Amino acid sequence: LLMACSLLFMVGCGDDEDDEEDAEVAIEVPTAYTFDSRFIEGESSVSYSGQTVRNLLWQDLKIKTDSVGKSGAQALTANDFNALYDHKDASNMKTLTTAGGTPLVADAYSKISTGKNLKGKISADPVIGYGKPADALVQEWFQTIAENCKDSSKLGTAAAYTDENGVDLSQMINKVLVGAVHYYQSTGVYLNGILEQENSKQYKDDPAKTYTAMEHKWDEAFGYFGAARDYLSYSDAQLAGKTPAEFSRDSNGDGKIDFKSEYNFGLSRNAGKRDKGGSGTDLTKDIFQAFVAGRAIIAGEGDINQVAAQREIAAAGMEKVIAATVVHYINDTLADMSKLGTADENKKDLNKHWAEMKGFTVALQYSPFKKVTDGNLAELHGIMGKSPSYAKPGSAEYDQTVANYKRAKQVLQVACGFSAENVAKW
């Protein structure tokens, strides 16, 4: 049985229109993202299978773009990447993601949810610093990797997914998409429009639906965060782990992993990483509890202002996760740059960390609730440029680049209220 705590929210329930008093109604807030249907007894009202498929497609696309840099790699084309990015059910494709040695409830995308892809959900807004939408950038990057694959000297090495300026395109694609699809859809579409949703009858008046429009749209926002239903039962170390055995679990004991409820994706794992590497932060708890509390208020037809408050907490938490991750990769980039010209120089690592820094910075633009303003982002992109710097320690260019990156950290620290300690050690 799931433990639950009760929170009190003010809900007006008087029959007389002149009755000015509201009654306090206790709304149960479970510790897991689990809610029963108001309409069909014994059924769950939680539904975000489409988001699960998009999390898998996004993760599998990274596996695919990384693959061309591994020993024994096969050359891939832009069509191979688009088969995931613009996925079609007719392809009958199975996910590349595993749960270690544990069987899966479903491994084909269309068995989890039909008609889902990444391309159809990507923001059309121009990317700050690039002047074109993320979809156009992603297509250019697919083509560059495909062209690199034709060069036998590059295929099977990091050069296969790296452009001529040292940009790790596998990382750029992955990080830009988590912003332009997942973060954008969660905050810019679903949370942004949640207060206008209907919350008293079955979705689309369909008697088979177990949820209202507001319940479903909130679930979809949560689905893009990527957390397992029992997210808070995972430690930060598990969420930050490298293997599925750490960040997934057979919670219901059926001997299988259900990607819809028993696996942690993307942003939810980044939150654990930043909590693990920081002090005095609990982004995992802040975000998850806001999603659960907001959903409980919606299910209990509670105060819409309380829904709005939980929406703000969830959106702010996700922004902090992304911003803290930018800080983390600024620190990694600075560490890599300090080794240039020495025996420990590793440009592959520098290219990787720079692209992660840059890609997550792009991701920050997509929330209407953001504290990191477009002006801040323009400054950050101006600092970072469009490729890594290979200036060696001792040069004026190196000193200026280091000073600029430290300024970038300060911008994020002020905007998000990060402690100096965390900005230094993330």
Model-derived features with residue positions:
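Bacterial signal peptide processing site
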Residues: 14-17
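Mature extracytoplasmic or organellar-lumen-exposed domains after removal of signal/transit peptides
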Residues: 21-426
